[in-house]
Amino acid sequence: TKEFFVHSMDLRTNHYYTPDGLARMVRKASGTRYYNRIAYSLQPLTDSTCNILFDVTENPLTFAKIGLHYNEFSGISAILNLTNRDFFIPNSRDLVTLNIGENFRFRAEHLQYLGRISNFAFTLGTQFDQFNITTYNNYKESGLYDQSYLKFDGKLGYSTNRNLTIGIGSRFEWIKYNPNIASSLEFEGKNNFLTSYFFIRQNTLDKPSYPKRGIKIDAEADWVYTQNADVVVHQTPTSLDSVFSEDPYGRVLFNFESYSPVGRRGTILANIQAGINFNYQNNIMNEFSIGGLTPLFHNEITFAGLREGTFYSPSVAEFRLGYRYQMFTNTYLTARANILFNNFISTSSFFINPDVLSGYALTFTYNFALGPLEVSAMYCDQSRRVIGYVNIGIPF
């Protein structure tokens, strides 16, 4: 509506605006994703003031998307998305996304803009994931289990501008492990807990895929309340009911991405990831999974050189540098090197992890209609193995 557009920019009559100020206001309105195109012109008046004329093209209120995705970890899947704006309440967005394939995933979300300039947003959402996850022992496949994950989430965010959001929220999480092929150490059972958190999100990337400049920050400080574990440990040669801690604990999650152009075709990449559970000794089912190049599921710390779930750790910090070169239009070659530190705050009572890991990856990418085709070769100094990694399309 006209009112929402004017309010989203905080545009007022009989005010003085500079060209830079108008540009920032237009970017704020674009950040709501309600508009496909916003252009403006100035019409001089006889009293030395101007009328501002806006030419605005709105996005459809309802639209559907269909995509295909393949990854060696998650398999092949079709991704279906339906998004509607202002369906239940004005100034809102509702979406439902399905991932149908070798692993089933579901997400639903309602976002409600609040305030005159829509700088507050209240979000209610739910998500369900089901994965078949390979376990590893000494860097080799040793088992397979089903992981089911369900969460209900509510949060309130405040945007100082469309690039920076801070807020608070709470979520309920339910996790179930069911071994299919038991390894030397497996959990079987379920756990659930409530988490309250404070978050900061910033995104100044010039484009969502293969940006050349900008930063992206996702930071979260959590407090995990009492857990409700109903779990049995299968540990060769016996199975036992271990004593699990249900004590509350704090945790921090952090992800930083930076892109800096070098010449006409080059880009320097930098990435810092951290996941830390404090006072996490006999607690379970909230460790951080180490491995993989593509972020796919909760509590994942990507690492060039290892497959998803090679290690699980309660305290992880990863540092990565890379260089991406655009060979031709939509064709890229990317080199990455990373180092990862474990066990520097909390140490798991159930998982054995090396204190330091280092690895490398070389990726060829062709960006086409279905999304990026990424073929990688990875190497880890500790495993001393070269492994391949393939990702096609944009993940769930």
Predicted regions and their residues:
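Extended hydrophobic-aromatic, low-complexity segments
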Residues: 2-3, 283, 314, 328-335, ...
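Acidic/histidine-rich, surface-exposed loop or edge segments in extracytoplasmic proteins
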Residues: 2-12
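Gram-negative/organellar outer-membrane beta-barrel architecture
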Residues: 10, 15-209, 290-300, 309-317, ...
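Small/polar, glycine/serine/threonine/aspartate-rich low-complexity segments that form flexible
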Residues: 62-74, 280-282, 345-356
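Short glycine-rich beta-strand segments
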Residues: 127-131, 171-175, 220-228, 275-279, ...
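A generic beta-sheet turn/junction motif
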Residues: 263, 366-370, 381-383
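C-terminal hydrophobic structural anchor segments
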Residues: 322-358
